[in-house]
């Protein structure tokens, strides 16, 4: 994240100085950042910075979004809002997440990797967090 305002972080990444506020405003509203549009990113909380980074990813044109722990710095309510925004904006989303319940709730398919190999590749529907326990057992630190 650049240490500029939320607005500059969203607009400068892919279309410098040509982005109209109308393009960014729906993303800011969805991520509840409208009141921070001109705030320096350094003044934002960790969760607000993370939402700004998600906003940049949502603003980027394309059909695929890949994210590593996109909701790690926000509370559960905000995590759900962010995941709704992510999954509602891009047809293909690949997320690395450790929150098993949220992964099951928002994913169509779960792929678990253990020791560098695919240990799980199943539809998320009908799964429960305990079904994923084996992925976390005997992990080396």
Place the predicted regions along the sequence by residue:
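Conserved beta-strand-loop-alpha-helix hinge in the C-terminal portion
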Residues: 117-140
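H-loop/switch region of ABC-family ATPase nucleotide-binding domains
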Residues: 97-98
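Hydrophobic anchor residue at the start of the ABC signature
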Residues: 54
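Conserved ABC ATPase signature
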Residues: 40-44, 48
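Catalytic Walker B motif of ABC-type/P-loop ATPase nucleotide-binding domains
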Residues: 65-68
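A short, surface-exposed alpha-helical micro-motif characterized by mixed small hydrophobic
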Residues: 103-105
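Conserved ABC ATPase "signature" region
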Residues: 7, 11-36
